[in-house]
Amino acid sequence: MLDNGFSFPVRVYYEDTDAGGVVYHARYLHFFERARTEYLRTLNFTQQTLLEEQQLAFVVKTLAIDYCVAAKLDDLLMVETEVSEVKGATILFEQRLMRNTLMLSKATVKVACVDLGKMKPVAFPKEVKAAFHHLK
């Protein structure tokens, strides 16, 4: 666990790779998404509960990703996730995919809170915002 973030292990499976055993570029997004979801779970929130009880969903608003070094079949990796900014309806995540101390990829992901009934951005629930502010 990072000081103000979360670490999540991922193993590279055959389904994640191309014919050469290298992780397909879109799979990195899956790894980052899983880590953000599990991070939320450690704060005692689930996307399913927010969806069912409040009709809220977290959606990716913007994403920037850098691929530095290829991940390969059977690698055991760590996704490090930190919150760098919390605003009314958005949270900015900084994420790194690591193999030991080597950074393979990094991503900056802005996630927005959306009211699914209106399909418009809304402020994060107070308890979610407070949980993330506590980490900063």
UniProtKB/Swiss-Prot annotation:
It comes from the Bacteria. It is an enzyme of class 3 (hydrolase). Disulfide bonds: none annotated. Keywords: Hydrolase. One of its GO terms (molecular function) is fatty acyl-CoA hydrolase activity. It holds the Pfam family 4HBT_2. The active site is at D18. Its EC number is 3.1.2.-. Displays acyl-CoA thioesterase activity with short chain aliphatic acyl-CoA thioesters, such as propionyl-CoA and butyryl-CoA. Enzyme activity is relatively low, suggesting that the acyl-CoA thioesters used in the assays are not the physiological substrates. Has no detectable activity with 4-hydroxybenzoyl-CoA, lauroyl-CoA (C12:0), arachidoyl-CoA (C20:0) and arachidonoyl-CoA (C20:4). Belongs to the 4-hydroxybenzoyl-CoA thioesterase family. This is Acyl-CoA thioesterase YbgC. It comes from Haemophilus influenzae (strain ATCC 51907 / DSM 11121 / KW20 / Rd). The lineage of its organism: Bacteria, Pseudomonadati, Pseudomonadota, Gammaproteobacteria, Pasteurellales.
